[in-house]
Every structure is written in C-alpha cells, then in structure tokens.
Curated annotation (Swiss-Prot):
Disulfide bonds: none annotated. Pfam families: Ribosomal_S8 (PF00410). The lineage of its organism: Bacteria, Pseudomonadati, Pseudomonadota, Alphaproteobacteria, Rickettsiales. This is Small ribosomal subunit protein uS8. Gene3D superfamilies: 3.30.1370.30, 3.30.1490.10. Coiled coil: none annotated.
Length: 132
C-alpha cells in the first residue's frame, strides 16, 4: 500500500490513538516520521517508541503515547505543509504555534528540527506540523 502523505497518516494515527486512549499505536516506518518521533520524545510529548518488523518484513514504529491525569499530553497536532500545498518559511518569518506555547516541526537543510532551534541557527525550511 502506497501512501501519498505518510506524515499526515502518522499524525492521524496519533490523534486517533489518543482519542481512543490507546497506550500504543503502530505507524509505518520512514526516516521523516522517525525524525519527528525523536523530536516528540525529546520534548516529552510521547513516552517512547521502538522499531518492529512484521513477519512480511515490513518495518513499523511502535509509539507509546503519553497521558497526564487521564488526558492526552498532545492537545493538538496539525499538518501544515502537505503535498498539494507546501508551506516554506525563512528563519525570520517562522511563525509561533499558539503564541509560543506549542512548537512547529520544520524540515531544514540540516535535518528536521523545532522552530526555535531553526530560528536560533538562522535557517528556514518547510513547516511540517504543529504540536500543542
């Protein structure tokens, strides 16, 4: 099965998993999704993740979701740039998500990183998603 937008599929699986109060969700493996998960783990939005393979050899990422007082830690996660409409921004024009309470995840020439790190390094890129 080929996905036209694996990032949107990943974000939807996270949202649906948290809406159903699931402890874990499985997402198809890709380099970009793994980079986003590294960022979410470092920022404390998820408990952790591991790489697993099914018997057919397909790689999946097992994501352990995080809750606080029986409520999901991720309040809102939205896809910004999509295949039909890419959204790029320079370092000085990178917006703030929820007035700085949330973060944007940006794909830059130096890899996938958070918006405030991209501003600090002075590099722009494609705004992948916002997390609050």
């Amino acid at each position: 099965m080929s996905l036209s937008d694996p990032i949107a599929d990943f974000l939807t699986r996270l949202r649906n998993g948290q809406a159903g109060m699931n402890k874990v969700v499985f997402v198809p493996h890709s380099k970009v999704v793994r980079s986003i998960l590294d960022i979410l783990l470092a920022e404390g939005y998820i408990e952790g993740f591991t790489e697993e393979s099914k018997s057919s050899g397909i790689k999946y990422l097992k994501v352990c979701l995080k809750y606080y007082n029986c409520a999901p830690v991720i309040k809102k996660i939205v896809r910004v740039s999509r295949p039909g409409k890419r959204v790029y921004s320079s370092a000085d024009r990178l917006p703030k998500f929820y007035n700085g309470l949330g973060v944007y995840i940006v794909s830059t020439s130096q890899g996938v990183m958070l918006d405030y790190r991209a501003r600090k390094l002075g590099i722009g890129g494609e705004i992948l998603c916002g997390v609050f």
